[in-house]
Amino acid sequence: VKKHLTVAAAAVATLSVAGPAVAANGPFAFEPIDGSAYTQQSATWAEPLVAPAGFTQQLVADETVLDIYGGDADDLTDMNVHNETGPDAGRYLIRTHEVGSNGAVSVVDLRTGEARVVAQDAGFKRLDGIEWTSWGTVLFAEETAGGRLFEGFFDPKNPFAPMEWVARPEVGILRHEGIGAMADGTVFVIDELNGGSIFKFVPTTRGDLSDGQLYALKVSGLSDAEQLWDASSYLAKSGAFEWVALDMDQVVLDANVAADAVSASEFGRPEDVEIIGQKVYVANTTEDRVVEIDLTKSVLNTFVHAGDNVPTENRSAGVTGFNSPDNLAKSGDGRLWIVEDNVPSDIWATQPDTDGDGQADRVELFASAVDPGAEISGIYFGTDPKTLYFNIQHPTKPLADGTWKITRR
């Protein structure tokens, strides 16, 4: 592979790969930090990240502002999205909370700082992914066996009123995490397990998720046995692919069973989904890989992979590297950002593929979490291209589970 790095080389190249020290120009340009926060772990932090100079970290809302579950129970603030269109676009931050039962969706007024729960149900389990649609609704879903995807009807004129919602089983009963909705109404989702597939829902009518067809991705040229998840051969799942239509009667019961019936490609814990133009990115956590699905060319590329175009982590040796990619975000200049499900949890920024090999030209370390028990989740660029929102989930520091933002000065 053209950008292959050995672990030994990674010890030298912890900041960035194949590029200058400063990560691009634009509204969120930065100088990569020296490495993961291995020696800076603290449960009494004032700021949650080791971050580059020139950036300001500010609390948006934690459990001192809104404590949904009380006592020692973490709110498990997970994913974030703005009300991206309509009246007061960008004023409100809508968040999921990934608790095992009685899950919740909360809203923060970014002007006043007020935060309230707008949707909660005893049957909500592990609410995770969230996405604003171009038709003005909010999608959120459960990351659990039998998980459902819901469509919520958020009213920015009455933002703290109980939000009406409806289940959309036609998009698939799955272990949902990432959700990506295109302007034409197409929705991309995943099944979050080793052996999970990647799915595309095409509605019969744009904006109506109650009727349509779910498809699963199938890489071309592989036998049915080779389509199965295998930790030793997952890199073979690249190249040309097709979308295979699934049995909708089975989809609304268990879309993973429907995908298995057509021998759809299986991946290692696909988690978040991010759409940038006509490319869909999926973080495959077990594979230490982010794949790029080129919708125009019908080609799947390995966009980021530990040991290829980003160093492999070796904490025992003090080597910063890429480990367990989880959530994804698109910055205002169209770059893909990645956060790890790891301790210390790191945030990485990519530079687009300009030489046509399907890989990110550079992958650079932006920040690292200092709390010894926390992971970063929910990275999200909203309407301000100089601001990145993120959550600190299940920290050691008391009442600190919640949302922050980091802004370039």
Residue ranges: model-predicted function:
Residues 1-23:
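Secretory targeting and sorting signals
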Residues 23-409:
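Sequence/structural signature of beta-propeller domains
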